[in-house]
Amino acid sequence: MTSPALKDPAKTRVIVGMSGGVDSSVSALLLMEQGYQVEGLFMKNWEEDDGTEYCTAREDLADAQAVCDRIGIKLHTANFAAEYWDNVFEHFLEEYKAGRTPNPDILCNREIKFKAFLDYALSLGADLIATGHYVRRRDTGAVTELLKGLDPNKDQSYFLHAVGGKEIARTLFPVGELEKPEVRAIAEKHGLATAKKKDSTGICFIGERRFSDFLKQYLPAQPGEIQTTEGEVIGRHHGLMYHTIGQRQGLGIGGLKDAGDEPWYVLHKDLTRNVLVVGQGNEHPWLFSRALLASEIFWVNPIDLSSPRTLTAKVRYRQSDQRCTLALTESGYRAVFDEPQRAVTPGQSVVFYDGEVCLGGGVIETAEPWSPRA
């Protein structure tokens, strides 16, 4: 089967997901220059905070419209707030209730940007969609692979690992072959309103507010004890959901007699007892894992795991590739690392690579300690 991307650009209608940022703006411009029939689409995925200081949707829509007006393309708008609530946000809350630390951006990409948006674009008569993600695609016969973005500082394949090959085959990634400074320079050269706009950071629906303030609107806090690894009570937490493995800030521990000056870190969340276990030192042994179990694995394309495979993996965004051996066991997918991994966090994602190819990944269920715990 020939990939849709291999058609004549002049006969190919592409709808670009316009976020109001510089990356999607330049993506639309580049596709225009390549001869595609280009239109834009602005997605509204969150409605809870309309009219508040935290919601930037109006500003983002205005920026997207300004860019579309500048380059002379039509801008569609679509409201996917209901789909986002049902397929992303409710899962986000359930994970926090379970004491885990989820990554909603990964689910948003799979369920909204490469499902709801793709379906909507196809219903408008599009042949392909495009986004401003820093990833690349490679077509090999009937198979479309997801590759890391050329800019190692901006590569976003970690966040797109749960998107299937069929969806990738329907998508163009114009800035994936560029580095960020090049993208801004192109936007500046063409007078795009988003040329100097700051990149968005953090979880989209939280904005600039404190995470704990946001979360307590939806989940009741359950305060409990903070204990050392020896079981000594040294403080109280406001709720396990506010903390993640490896966290240093916001523990409220200080001035303890004979404790020394080394900072305290979250080592473990004991969900059964509602206890936050902490220890001192960035290199505390409890922070390191030798292996992990993952579930809910999504492969971009099916892979053969009839025998263990040596791959590389990331257990967090921006982490360098870590060599591991992946095997399918009765308990799930088990990755054993060559080197100890710090702060492996249940609920976060582990993403597997073969060189520059992103194979897929899944949710971390448990981490196995690097050294035995008493």
Curated annotation (Swiss-Prot):
ATP binds at residues 17-24, 43, 132. The record marks 133, 348 as: Interaction with tRNA. GO terms for cellular component: cytoplasm. The keyword ATP-binding applies. SUPFAM superfamilies: Adenine nucleotide alpha hydrolases-like. Pfam families: tRNA_Me_trans, tRNA_Me_trans_C, tRNA_Me_trans_M. Gene3D superfamilies: Adenine nucleotide alpha hydrolases-like domains, HUPs, Translation factors. It comes from the Bacteria. One of its GO terms (molecular function) is tRNA binding. Residues 103-105 are annotated as: Interaction with target base in tRNA. Its main location: cytoplasm. Disulfide bonds join 108-204. InterPro entries: MnmA-like, MnmA-like_C, MnmA-like_central, MnmA-like_central_sf, Rossmann-like_a/b/a_fold. It catalyses: S-sulfanyl-L-cysteinyl-[protein] + uridine(34) in tRNA + AH2 + ATP = 2-thiouridine(34) in tRNA + L-cysteinyl-[protein] + A + AMP + diphosphate + H(+). Keywords: ATP-binding, Cytoplasm, Disulfide bond, Nucleotide-binding, RNA-binding, Transferase, tRNA processing, tRNA-binding. Belongs to the MnmA/TRMU family. Catalyzes the 2-thiolation of uridine at the wobble position (U34) of tRNA, leading to the formation of s(2)U34. HAMAP family: tRNA_thiouridyl_MnmA. This is tRNA-specific 2-thiouridylase MnmA. It comes from Pseudomonas putida (strain W619).
